[in-house]
């Protein structure tokens, strides 16, 4: 028996002894389960049962739990650091045993034959398939989300005040309405699905555009308030509010259009986009998605003030005599915690040191799995010399309609929204010169707290200079105060003092010119109106 199969057997026995009948327990033997020495073939001729080896050498199959079943990764035995292919093993996977060591399995669009190194390995893999097929988890959502996180999430969106905060975002709400009403041809007499409907405002827009029926899905307590709005506006024959998660509910029919507002900070936070993509199972072929795709923009920035602010906060823990207590042992952890916080605020785009890199998420075609691990390569051509303190993030989404395309932007050059922008600091900033190239990557790794761990890795090309950081998108620092955005230092090309006095002189000259014109006209000016024929002496009292 191989070490991998022995480990899987031991884990299987432990779970059986525990007698736990949960999804996690049922999948327990799959944890860190690997099968080495597997020969993978494709069916070349079904009638003659002829097979062709896909890879030149034997492979290792790695099986790990995923929210949709089991993720199977294929690697070469002699190069396990490189994943050749990934497949999702789900309850719908077709599979069959072929003899004692082989197994035929249909994974996505590939029909494969797996020949294992031993009978025992084949039996264990068959157990993997059987476990997945017998699982009927409550929902994809419940598998990817901690119960405590889900509870807080739906409680938060169940408050009217939070719905009001989003509805009063004029840019957000008006852009959605314009996108829907401006493409009424996509909604006229159509069946519409509103995912995460909240108050139902988008459902009302769909009805305004002529929708025949709207299914408004809302998992929080806000569903009851949405129902009240539907009834008070007499559109209950048009809008059907369905309490629940889209991953769990059933619709009576397929839909023509899906509408939703699934974006979070940095586009991906809250993992609502996965729910939005999951809803496509109810979308008719050639159906529409509003919005259609999202662009995440990333740019290096320089901001000494922000960096110093966070650094000085952490220095609280550098005190050796705080009320007689030495805190310095926690300074390193304090520094780490503050720099793990993404900063949510807004800024002048002139702090960006290069043109932003754009990463596209295609809501019509991307899969939910694509959002579990998002790897974004970076290459910036630096436009100004300075200190790079980290990366700035914002996003745009496009509504691609049949009549017109409409964009909703959270760029620092666009009107401010409740998404603001997000900045991720480097604990060790790097000095970079104009003309140099900054390369690296951003890795967004989904977690069960409905958020992402964000890893930044930057390197100045042609040097040994690099810097990195990992941040917790679930725990941002909300820095926005409402104060006007200040221009970055060094952007004045003229004396601000002289500019001010010149402006004052100009205003005084203009005022003097207006007064002179009034006197020359010989009239009395009242609220800017004058009668040139009026005698200004009339009505004046003279001493006797």
Curated annotation (Swiss-Prot):
List modified residues, type Asymmetric dimethylarginine.
Answer: 514
Enzyme Commission designation: 2.1.1.319
Where is the stretch described as Disordered?
Answer: 505-527
Entry keyword set: Chromatin regulator, Cytoplasm, Methylation, Methyltransferase, Nucleus, S-adenosyl-L-methionine, Transcription, Transcription regulation, Transferase
The subcellular localization recorded is: Cytoplasm; Nucleus
GO biological process terms on file: chromatin remodeling; peptidyl-arginine methylation, to asymmetrical-dimethyl arginine; positive regulation of ecdysone receptor signaling pathway; positive regulation of transcription by RNA polymerase II; regulation of DNA-templated transcription
| Residues binding S-adenosyl-L-methionine | 163, 172, 196, 218, 247, 275
* Main localization (coarse): cytoplasm
Q: What top-tier enzyme class does this entry carry?
A: transferase
Q: Which GO terms describe its molecular function?
A: histone H3R17 methyltransferase activity; histone H3R2 methyltransferase activity; histone H3R26 methyltransferase activity; protein-arginine omega-N asymmetric methyltransferase activity; protein-arginine omega-N monomethyltransferase activity
User: Compositionally biased, Polar residues: which spans?
Assistant: 505-520
Among InterPro entries, the record links this protein to: Arg_MeTrfase, PH-like_dom_sf, PRMT_dom, SAM-dependent_MTases_sf
Question: Is rRNA-binding given among the entry's keywords?
Answer: no
Please report the PTM annotation for this entry.
Answer: The dimethylated protein is the major form.
Catalytic reaction equation(s): L-arginyl-[protein] + 2 S-adenosyl-L-methionine = N(omega),N(omega)-dimethyl-L-arginyl-[protein] + 2 S-adenosyl-L-homocysteine + 2 H(+)
Q: Where is the SAM-dependent MTase PRMT-type domain?
A: 150-459
Q: Which family does it belong to?
A: Belongs to the class I-like SAM-binding methyltransferase superfamily. Protein arginine N-methyltransferase family.
Q: How does it assemble?
A: Homodimer.
Protein name, UniProt field: Histone-arginine methyltransferase CARMER
Query: What is the organism lineage in this UniProt record?
Result: Eukaryota, Metazoa, Ecdysozoa, Arthropoda, Hexapoda
Gene responsible for this protein: Art4
